[in-house]
């Protein structure tokens, strides 16, 4: 099997699962928290799909660098932990010094969080979110290209 075919199949399966997960999460928010979804479902799906592909690329790149299968989890945590801390997952990145805000906004998880929040909670159109989408496209594209180059079957 060619590496490209394998990686595309992996990305496609992740996209299908992600669509189901996002739909269930939105439904849960609407039913139990009376959340109003102000953005279009198409925009939300596109942002979530792009986020899924972005982090699929980051994950594959990280895993491709591991020498042993046992070290993949540790490497993923090493990459993701700073993003969880800085990207506004647990608390607003606005609490960090203004000096590092540009770096935080260049992280793919920050772009994904901000884009989803803006679309779902504020109804921000997709075209107004192009800087966030560009961050995710760059991270995902570069990660996938490097993962294809460095991916090992052994």
Regions found by a protein language model. Name each.
Residues 28-32, 62, 66, 86, ...:
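Hydrophobic alpha-helical interface/terminus motif in multipass membrane transporters
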Residues 148-154:
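Short cytosolic juxtamembrane segments of multi-pass membrane proteins
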Residues 36, 87-142:
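Membrane-interfacial helix-loop-helix junctions in multi-pass membrane proteins
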């Amino acid at each position: 099997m060619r590496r490209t075919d394998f990686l595309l199949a992996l990305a496609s399966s992740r996209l299908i699962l992600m669509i189901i997960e996002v739909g269930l999460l939105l439904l849960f928010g609407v039913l139990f928290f009376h959340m109003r979804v102000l953005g279009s479902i198409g925009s939300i799906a596109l942002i979530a799909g792009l986020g899924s592909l972005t982090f699929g690329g980051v994950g594959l790149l990280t895993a491709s660098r591991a020498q042993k299968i046992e070290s993949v989890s540790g490497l993923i945590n090493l990459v993701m932990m700073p993003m969880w801390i800085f990207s506004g997952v647990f608390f607003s990145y606005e609490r960090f010094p203004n000096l590092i805000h540009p770096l935080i906004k260049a992280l793919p998880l920050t772009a994904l969080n901000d884009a989803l929040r803006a679309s779902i909670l504020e109804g921000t159109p997709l075209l107004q979110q192009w800087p966030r989408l560009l961050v995710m496209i760059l991270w995902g594209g570069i990660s996938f290209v490097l993962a294809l180059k460095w991916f090992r079957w052994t």
